[in-house]
């Protein structure tokens, strides 16, 4: 997507476990950050209502608002972009396309989908996948530097791990909540 604004450096992802504090977390983010609404646990009507309220709050703080879901839904719900695997991305560039990736083949798929950014995870051990294997800082950097597309670090990210990773863009669920 062509945009006048640079890609945000800080990204907050919603989840069932941070729902109760999202309003405060969104308000605390620096202006022109990004908010990715997931909330897969809600039925469609409740998901849309919660999205609308959080979208409006995020916009009051000049945040970019991304919907995890179909491009059709992202347009209908007035999101700035769509989040998900490369296979779910729209062919046009009307929405900001944030593609999830965990390895090199998924990064290549993101390039083919003409992603605006790749959310590469998990960098560190994470509550989302307890006991799961993480990339670690070295492997994360090796993968991230192989693509020209901006990469957003996700997974176990907090202010401390972001400082340790020393990467320009990062995202968190619990680490920003």
Please report, for each region that a protein language model flagged, where it lies by residue.
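Conserved, mostly hydrophobic/aromatic
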Residues: 12, 35, 74, 110, ...
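Alpha-helix-loop-beta-strand connector modules within alpha/beta enzyme cores
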Residues: 48-64, 89, 93-104, 133-158
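N-terminal active-site wall of soluble small-molecule enzyme domains
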Residues: 34-95
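Structural preference for beta-strand elements that scaffold enzyme active sites
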Residues: 9-11, 34-36, 62-66, 80-83, ...
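Short, acidic/polar
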Residues: 15-28, 70-72, 103-109, 158-161
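Acidic (Asp/Glu)-rich catalytic clusters
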Residues: 24-31, 56-60, 75, 111-114
């Amino acid at each position: 997507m062509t945009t006048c604004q640079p890609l945000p450096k800080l990204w907050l992802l919603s989840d069932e476990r941070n729902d109760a504090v999202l309003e405060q977390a969104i308000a605390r983010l620096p202006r022109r950050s990004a908010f990715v609404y997931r909330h897969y646990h809600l039925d469609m009507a409740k998901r849309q209502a919660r999205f609308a309220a959080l979208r409006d709050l995020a916009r009051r703080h000049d945040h970019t608002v991304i919907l995890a879901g179909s491009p059709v839904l992202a347009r209908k719900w007035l999101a700035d972009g769509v989040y998900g695997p490369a296979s779910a991305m729209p062919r046009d560039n009307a929405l900001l396309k944030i593609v999830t990736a965990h390895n090199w083949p998924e990064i290549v798929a993101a390039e083919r989908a003409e992603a605006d950014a790749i959310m590469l995870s998990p960098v560190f051990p994470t509550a989302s996948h307890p006991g799961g294997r993480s990339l670690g800082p070295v492997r994360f950097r090796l993968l991230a530097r192989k693509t020209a597309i901006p990469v957003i670090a996700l997974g176990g990210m907090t202010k401390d791990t972001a400082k340790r990773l020393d990467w320009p863009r990062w995202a968190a669920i619990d680490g920003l909540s």
